[in-house]
Amino acid sequence: MQSKADFIYQARPARVIFGAGSLHHLEREVVELGAERAIVLCTPEQRALAQDVIDRLGSRGAGIYDRATMHVPLEIARDARAFASSCGADCAIAIGGGSTVGLGKAIALESSLPILAIPTTYAGSEMTPIYGVTDGGIKRTGTDMRVLPKTVIYDPELTVTLPVELSVASGINAIAHAAEGLYANNANPVMSLIAEEGIRALAKGLPGVRRDGGDLRARSDALYGAWLCGMVLGNVGMALHHKLCHTLGGSFNLPHAQTHTVVLPHALAYNAAHAPDAMRRIARAIGADDAARGLYDLARDNGAPVALKVLGMKETDLDRAADLAVANPYWNPRPVEREALRVLLQYAFEGAPPRIYKT
């Protein structure tokens, strides 16, 4: 029989450059990867930022692909791979949030192209070997070490233009990684320490970002926390919360970070009685008496959404969402019961505070 002291910890290889102004080190880091021709991936909205990256690369810049979008549609992934091949690229730089990093991973999955990530949100995808592609309205995820970025540049200056409401939602999305990591079936003490510190840093930084989006100290706290929470996501398994969010995002096209923000308090309340130590750690990190209610209040008090209905979810789709979420068995500290899950989704739809969800 294993004791709580028995665990397996596998470090993930990644080079991290952190600090205000660290984008200045970009060309050095591309050289460090041995790359000669780098493409830059971005969303249409971040084309100007991608152009700045290309300008910094000089002759090493091979082109910009600006069609990254939520949930990585299969047709976009294929188009981006073809673009990389046509440019003769030997490196892809993903600048932006989880959508852009996700597109980089989709390219790396079949080409083994090294990825250099420059996050401008708190999504944390850059720290994980997890990829996802949406095909026919179904988001399919997997794990492959080839998709883990080789280098990550964290520059808090690049996050100051992220709208405050989206910043808070993106930060709580990051907290979700650490929160579920604390009760993962393969949790270990190393990741649990990192998870609690990541949650603490984000809970400290996000209210400061809400007060002043240009506060670099608050932005640094939030980005530091997001890095740590991303490490947790990349090292231990996830459970009900992430399954629900993948269902809502991939099948109903809800925005990623905001969906995590709405669902997290309810998923924690669902699992609370089956993961008491994790709940104590989360509550301690955010300075609250109750983990689920504390995260609900963190979102609400700082201008983030707390209801699925404001994200575009239709009440008539809640039954289908519950069916999809229980279609394929997965580990969770509490058995996933369809009726209780349907009640959870109703509360999340309405924006009601989390409660104990019984069958």
What positions do the PLM features span?
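ATP/NTP phosphate-donor binding region
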Residues: M1-D90, L308
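A glycine/threonine-rich phosphate-anchoring loop and its flanking beta-alpha core
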Residues: A14, H24, R28, L109-L193, ...
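Structural motif
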Residues: R15, R37-I39, G63, D90-I93, ...
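Short glycine/serine/threonine-rich phosphate/pyrophosphate-binding segments
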Residues: L23-L26, Q46-A50, L74, S99-A106, ...
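A short, small-residue-rich loop immediately preceding and capping a beta-strand
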Residues: A84-I107, S111-Y122, L244
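Active-site segments that bind and position negatively charged phosphate/pyrophosphate groups
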Residues: G181, N185-G294
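C-terminal charged capping/lid subdomain of soluble metabolic enzymes
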Residues: A285-T359
